[in-house]
């Protein structure tokens, strides 16, 4: 995989500077690596044009990064033949209820006494299950919710267990399954349902099915949820430090996010008012002087840095990361 990334990141400023035979070779290698097949030659040609445009974007960005313009690098991945608009349409899924408003009953009020650690990584504490892949189903909200529940289950019982996002996709009537949803609706469902099944009991299929919840497969409960004060990164930091992994919403609509590879992600075009994707904050820290959040995505391990991204922290609520943050009570 690393060999592929090196090959695909050869500088290319324009197609004219990139011999067609090299592009042909890289295209075939990319298709083989990610097992890409197309329905027709016309479809493949259109997908290759998108891939070439993305490859050029990646190469130019990385040249700029080498000159100090950016704090992060990009790399070609399995989303290479998709536009950023297609990624948002098919692989995000945050849908905030029109009537959503924070209640004093569910507002997280931080305990400001005492210091929080300068960094924390719940992966190292055993609170985080392996990275999953939601596929082309708008179920990011389910994976984000499940991740937060898994962290609290570990904290309460000492056991790390994969919970079922499919259970939420199929059964949370307030959400729209693969058509999108919201995390607090998922937490409320688990509370009212008195449980959520394990992944083993209710496997993920990546499409809407009838609700098949079975109490015999129940692996966790929920007593409610708390929401972080809107846009307050200090409160979010304290929640992550004191509570555990937190469900967050971000703008994932940019090509720079689609092909993120390493470094601290900050794109001034990221719109904090355009929240479209739910992910999981599993920690925070500082890398090369840059404060960041450690974010677990649900696009598989081929995306980002083995499925994760470091997102800028305390940079004016970049990408809206603290606007719709919440966690379950267990």
Swiss-Prot record:
Function: Thiol protease involved in osteoclastic bone resorption and may participate partially in the disorder of bone remodeling. Displays potent endoprotease activity against fibrinogen at acid pH. May play an important role in extracellular matrix degradation. Involved in the release of thyroid hormone thyroxine (T4) by limited proteolysis of TG/thyroglobulin in the thyroid follicle lumen.
Species whose genome carries this gene: Sus scrofa (Pig)
Signal sequence region: 1-16
GO terms under cellular component: apical plasma membrane; external side of plasma membrane; extracellular space; lysosome; nucleoplasm
Protein name: Cathepsin K
Main location: other
EC main group: hydrolase
Membrane topology: Peripheral membrane protein
Taxonomy of the source species: Eukaryota, Metazoa, Chordata, Craniata, Vertebrata
Residues annotated as glycosylated: 104
């Amino acid at each position: 995989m690393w060999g592929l990334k090196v090959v695909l990141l050869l500088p290319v400023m324009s197609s004219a500077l990139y011999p067609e035979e090299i592009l042909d070779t890289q295209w075939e290698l990319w298709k083989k690596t990610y097992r890409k097949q197309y329905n027709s030659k016309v479809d493949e040609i259109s997908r290759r044009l998108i891939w070439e445009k993305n490859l050029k974007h990646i190469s130019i960005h990385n040249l700029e990064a080498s000159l100090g313009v950016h704090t992060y690098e990009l790399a070609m991945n399995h989303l290479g033949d998709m536009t950023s608009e297609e990624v948002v349409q098919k692989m995000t899924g945050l849908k905030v209820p029109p009537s959503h408003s924070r209640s004093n009953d569910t507002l997280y009020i931080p305990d400001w006494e005492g210091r929080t650690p300068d960094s924390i990584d719940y992966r190292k504490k055993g609170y985080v299950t392996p990275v999953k892949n939601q596929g082309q189903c708008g179920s990011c909200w389910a994976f984000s919710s499940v991740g937060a529940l898994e962290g609290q289950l570990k904290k309460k019982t000492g056991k790390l267990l994969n919970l079922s996002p499919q259970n939420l996709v199929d059964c949370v009537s307030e959400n729209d399954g693969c058509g999108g949803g919201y995390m607090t609706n998922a937490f409320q469902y688990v509370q009212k349902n008195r449980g959520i099944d394990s992944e083993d009991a209710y496997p993920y299929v990546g499409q809407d099915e009838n609700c098949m919840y079975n109490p015999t497969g129940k692996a966790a409960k929920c007593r409610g949820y708390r929401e972080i004060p809107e846009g307050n990164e200090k409160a979010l930091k304290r929640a992550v430090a004191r509570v555990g992994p937190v469900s967050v919403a971000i703008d994932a609509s940019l090509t720079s996010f689609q092909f993120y590879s390493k470094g601290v992600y900050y794109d001034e075009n990221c719109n904090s008012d355009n929240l479209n994707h739910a992910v999981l904050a599993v920690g925070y820290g500082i890398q090369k002087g840059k404060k960041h959040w450690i974010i677990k995505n649900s696009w598989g391990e081929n995306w980002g840095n083995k499925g994760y991204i470091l997102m800028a922290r305390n940079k004016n609520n970049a990408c809206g990361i603290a606007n719709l943050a919440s966690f379950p009570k267990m």
